[in-house]
């Protein structure tokens, strides 16, 4: 499935239902306000390295995990 301008799809991000107009994992990371190099990502249970996020297409009902490092102790 290819997204068209203005089209939104239903996905799950970090266990919560969400909608996005992002066509790729990299676009979703940016849309959610994360710094590209500061997070780890998984799509449907599979790790997705930073270098391939821009070519990793999203589809309805995809399950995405985005993990950002935390500071503190």
Residue positions per predicted region:
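Ubiquitin-like/PB1-type beta-grasp interaction modules and other compact soluble beta-rich domains
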Residues: 1-72
């Amino acid at each position: 499935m290819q997204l068209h301008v203005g089209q939104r799809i239903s996905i799950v991000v970090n266990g919560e239902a969400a909608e996005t107009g992002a066509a790729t994992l990299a676009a979703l990371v940016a849309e959610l306000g994360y710094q590209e190099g500061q997070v780890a990502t998984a799509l449907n249970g599979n790790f997705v390295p930073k270098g391939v996020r821009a070519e990793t297409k999203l589809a309805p009902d995809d399950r995405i995990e985005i993990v950002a490092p935390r500071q503190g102790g």
